[in-house]
Amino acid sequence: MTEVLLEDLDHVGPATAQKLKDAGFTTIEAIAVASPAELANSAEIGESTAAKIINAARQSADIGGFETGDLVLERRKLVGKLSTGCTEFDEMMGGGIETQSITEMYGEFGSGKTQIAHQLAVNVQLPPEQGGLGGSVIMIDTENTFRPERIAQMVKGISDKHGIEYDPEEFLKNIHVARAFNSNHQILLVDSANELANELKNTEMPVKLLIVDSLTAHFRAEYIGRGTLADRQQKLNKHLHEILRFGDLSNACVVVTNQVMSKPDAFFGDPTKPIGGHILGHTATFRLYIRKSKGEKRIVKLVDSPNLPDGEALISVTTDGIGDA
């Protein structure tokens, strides 16, 4: 199939094509799923022109129409599964972490969210026969928790597990980390992630995993009090949809960690609740609640999924990484 260039679209001349590329809209698919207002503001073109360009892109990319369930099922075969490194965890997730979806992990401090994120950053680089996706990683670090030393320990762990001597430095070269200093910066980094994914698209290591650790930390710190709640949720909602679009366009896994709060008025059940409210609850495809157990063991509970039953998996967090308990 011949790749359609931006210049081939109706209403797009060389100057407009350059504006679109400069704004981060480098593919037909990216334009097809944008809104007219978003395209107009980003590329500095009129909103009516933006609407015409989007319609042309949708026709070209065959996006936006109805399709039968069997075609959806056929397309679902392109969805990849990333192994967590733990058999019980993988089985609960139907084979691993899915591409083209958001997997949210929430739990108290020290529950192992960042540890699992680090492990996935290693595992995704492995070939499919070893549970990986043969791709690189983009990590948006909001809490300064990325540790290359921990990656090196985990690479040693998988070297011992598979009986193959892997080089930690090679793994680190394929992890692209950016520190987000506030919520606006965090949102902008998703645009940068799209650009990087396009650059690496046809290389040996295309981007197959986006990690945001933690998704809600900056939003929680910057928007204080009920008076700012509506603004915070609107901004978070837009951010989540940008992240989800990244996963769709790159056929990549999207893993976000989330902080929790305690509800002191909860007399029955677990008082621990994730930050982000209903907006995050509706947008995340899979929700995982991680809590501490005895020693190095952790319990991972699948709280929400569109196609899998609720379940629990026992994992262990050791020097070698995440594994069977």
Swiss-Prot record:
One of its GO terms (molecular function) is ATP-dependent DNA damage sensor activity. It holds the Pfam family HHH_5. Disulfide bonds: none annotated. Keywords: ATP-binding, DNA damage, DNA recombination, DNA-binding, Nucleotide-binding. InterPro entries: AAA+_ATPase, DNA_recomb/repair_Rad51_C, DNA_recomb/repair_RadA, DNA_recomb/repair_RecA-like, DNA_repair_Rad51/TF_NusA_a-hlx, P-loop_NTPase, RecA_ATP-bd, RecA_monomer-monomer_interface. The keyword DNA damage applies. ATP binds at G107, E108, F109, G110, S111, G112, K113, T114. One of its GO terms (biological process) is DNA recombination. Belongs to the eukaryotic RecA-like protein family. Involved in DNA repair and in homologous recombination. Binds and assemble on single-stranded DNA to form a nucleoprotein filament. Hydrolyzes ATP in a ssDNA-dependent manner and promotes DNA strand exchange between homologous DNA molecules. This is DNA repair and recombination protein RadA. It comes from Methanococcoides burtonii (strain DSM 6242 / NBRC 107633 / OCM 468 / ACE-M).
